[in-house]
């Protein structure tokens, strides 16, 4: 592909970039490979459906291989198979709360029943009465309802008492317990570090009790993120100082409120509190102390960082001003995270559904207990691994399509001299160019990220499986490898994004674009450091502002429920969601800034302002980089390589 060809490198150094002029298809072999891979993903789904996995997944099946809600064929050498379950449409587990995490299944006999027990059944007499009234037998098919209380087999072939009240899961015809205590047992099996079962029960009940508040706070974080995007668009000059002041006030206010609540709850009388509420109060007090200490440490670190970067804050105003102009001309950029998230959700839903199909596909095999399991044998058993690789590659492909779309739109904006001549919808024009010319480049870039991500995930899995068993040296080596792969993945992701920008500008293949982008970034290393440090930090402050505001609102609202619920987990859920929402919105802004800078660097390298080679850039952006260079030089970090004076657009002087 020319990634390492010296001849290609020489040709690249002589080649002149012609933004938006020549357009051709790039990395076609990689597009064909990606299409073939997607066909393989479709084959896995089709194979699962064709072998009956879809019917077994949706309708469910009992422990003898009979699909509920239909007539079944007899399975060789398997008792109770081939039954007519036309009127038995629901799967009922005799012990639904008994979960086997290792084998990812419920360790219980499953039967097809006509109806789920809506009320708790405490005795076998209640089970018998339920069968006689509703015509739904909850014991094995070999036992008649009249024999439930008479036979000794009832303990093994009837449900575990008491039978919890259950309701059918929509679309999947499984009887699921409605009592959250059963789900608490599931979570207890997953969360092994919780030693006190009652703690987990209180945490889950806290989430269930505060679900309306959690939903409202999540919506608040979404609204705050959109408001921040509007502020960035219209008042970018004031935004930096507003963010700085608000983050200072927010971090101080949040830390102060946490310490105030801790002191208030610690001084509150406990003599009149009942034992159940006393335990909840102690949990809240401990959580408040941890939150307060963490917030204090975070605030101190944040202030130190802001103190070091105070001289560069003013420079960020110019950068945000130019990026704000992009959003004024390209307002649809704000909604790009929604389309990407929607595409990811659709793919993940398809992937999970196919994964569930794979869990019920294969040939019927009788296990040691005499029950039926479906297993895949031969080469087809490796479809799982293919499916997992598909999850990573296609997810990265969707994210890369977003990067290429944003890069194409911003490149169109930057290299259009008269902004009145911009396409009616630059975003759609960029999507059109992506589909027509550059899907192969996106496929190749996302595959490279996949190659790094898979080994890191394997090492993380090995590390988790060997936790507590390996020696200190092996543990250190594993963690070092994981960290190195993570750093490599981040570096490649940043280089990929700039490679997509280079492809959007000059329509070159991935290797050529990555090499050109890398050379330009190295030539402008000091400028990259200044822009990325200041710009990314201010966007990080925006994320902190949204999380602090949402968290502060959550503290005030959940504080009214501290007498009857533990709000540690609800607050964590809200803050995590707020950060994810803020990250999705502000990452687009960060992407625009990176694309603008690469366009600027290319502009200054290949144009000098003379007739026929006029600059494309905005004057504000050039002034920003010049001021950044001066600031770094005054700090003693400027170098001779960056000592040339940048000239404004009208001057006609060259600059690098």
From Swiss-Prot:
Q: Does the keyword Metal-binding apply?
A: no
Q: What induces it?
A: By leukemia inhibitory factor or retinoic acid in vitro. In vivo, induced during the axonal elongation period following axotomy.
Chain segments carrying region Disordered: 635-656
Q: Which residues cross the membrane?
A: 30-50, 212-232, 238-258, 288-308, 315-335, 338-358, 380-400, 442-462, 537-557, 566-586
Reactions mediated catalytically: choline(out) + n H(+)(in) = choline(in) + n H(+)(out); ethanolamine(out) + n H(+)(in) = ethanolamine(in) + n H(+)(out)
Q: How does it sit in the membrane?
A: Multi-pass membrane protein
Annotated GO biological process: choline transport; ethanolamine transport; transmembrane transport
Which residues does the record list as glycosylated?
134, 179
Q: Where in the cell is it found?
A: Cell membrane; Mitochondrion outer membrane
The chain's disulfide connectivity reads none
Q: Which family does it belong to?
A: Belongs to the CTL (choline transporter-like) family.
Name of the molecule in the record:
Choline transporter-like protein 1
Lineage start: Eukaryota, Metazoa, Chordata, Craniata, Vertebrata
């Amino acid at each position: 592909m020319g990634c390492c060809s010296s001849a290609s490198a020489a040709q690249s150094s002589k080649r002149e970039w012609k933004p938006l002029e020549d357009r051709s298809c790039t990395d076609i072999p990689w597009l064909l490979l990606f299409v073939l891979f997607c066909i393989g993903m479709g084959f896995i789904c089709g194979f699962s459906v064709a072998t009956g996995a879809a019917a077994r997944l949706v309708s469910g099946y009992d422990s003898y291989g009979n699909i509920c809600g239909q007539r079944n064929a007899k399975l060789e050498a398997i008792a109770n198979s081939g039954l007519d379950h036309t009127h038995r449409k629901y799967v009922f587990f005799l012990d639904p709360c008994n979960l086997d995490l290792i084998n990812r299944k419920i360790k219980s006999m499953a039967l097809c029943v006509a109806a789920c027990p809506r009320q708790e059944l405490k005795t076998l007499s209640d089970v018998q009465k339920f069968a006689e009234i509703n015509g739904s037998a909850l014991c094995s098919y070999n036992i008649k309802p009249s024999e439930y209380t008479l036979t000794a087999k009832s303990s093994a072939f009837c449900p575990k008492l008491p039978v919890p009240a259950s309701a059918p899961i929509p679309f999947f015809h499984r009887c699921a317990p409605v009592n959250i205590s059963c789900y608490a047992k599931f979570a207890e099996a997953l969360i092994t570090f919780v030693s006190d079962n009652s703690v987990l029960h209180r945490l889950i009940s806290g989430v269930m009790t505060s679900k309306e508040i959690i939903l409202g706070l999540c919506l608040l974080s979404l609204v705050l993120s959109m408001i921040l995007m509007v502020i960035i668009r219209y008042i970018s000059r004031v935004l930096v100082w507003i963010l700085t002041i608000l983050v200072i006030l927010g971090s101080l206010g949040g830390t102060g409120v946490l310490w105030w609540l801790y002191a208030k709850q610690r001084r509150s009388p406990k003599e009149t509190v009942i034992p159940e509420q006393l335990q909840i109060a102690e949990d809240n007090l401990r959580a408040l102390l941890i939150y307060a200490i963490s917030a204090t440490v975070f605030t101190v670190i944040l202030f130190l960082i802001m103190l070091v970067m105070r001289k560069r804050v003013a420079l960020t105003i110019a950068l945000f001003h130019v990026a704000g102009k992009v959003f004024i001309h390209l307002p649809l950029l704000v909604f790009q995270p929604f389309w990407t998230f929607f595409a990811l959700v659709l793919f993940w839903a398809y992937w999970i559904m196919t994964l569930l199909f794979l869990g019920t596909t294969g040939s019927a095999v009788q296990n040691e207990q005499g029950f039926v399991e479906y297993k895949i044998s031969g080469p087809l058993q490796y479809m799982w691994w293919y499916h997992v690789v598909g999850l990573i590659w296609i997810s990265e492909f969707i994210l890369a399509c977003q990067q290429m779309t944003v890069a194409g739109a911003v490149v169109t904006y930057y290299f259009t001299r008269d902004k009145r001549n911009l396409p009616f919808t630059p975003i759609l024009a960029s999507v059109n160019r992506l589909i027509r010319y550059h899907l192969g480049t996106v496929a190749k870039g996302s595959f490279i990220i996949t190659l790094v991500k898979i080994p890191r995930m394997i090492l993380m899995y090995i590390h988790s499986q060997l936790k507590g068993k390996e020696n200190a040296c092996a543990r250190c080596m594993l963690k070092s490898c994981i960290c190195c792969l993570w750093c490599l993945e981040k570096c490649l992701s940043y280089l990929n994004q700039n490679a997509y920008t280079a492809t959007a500008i000059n329509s070159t293949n991935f290797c050529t674009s990555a090499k050109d982008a890398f050379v330009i970034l190295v030539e402008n290393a000091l400028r990259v450091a200044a822009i990325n440090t200041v710009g990314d930090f201010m966007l990080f402050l925006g994320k902190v502002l949204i999380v602090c505001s949402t968290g502060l609102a959550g503290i005030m609202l959940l504080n009214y429920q501290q007498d009857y619920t533990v709000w540690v987990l609800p607050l964590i859920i809200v803050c995590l969601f707020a950060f994810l929402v803020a990250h999705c919105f502000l990452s687009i802004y960060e992407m625009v800034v990176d694309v603008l800078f690469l366009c600027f660097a290319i502009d200054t390298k290949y144009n000098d302002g003379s007739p026929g080679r006029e600059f494309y850039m905005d004057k504000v952006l050039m002034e920003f980089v010049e001021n950044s260079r001066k600031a770094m030089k005054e700090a003693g970090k400027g170098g001779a390589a960056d000592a040339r004076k940048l000239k404004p657009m009208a001057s006609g002087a060259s600059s690098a």
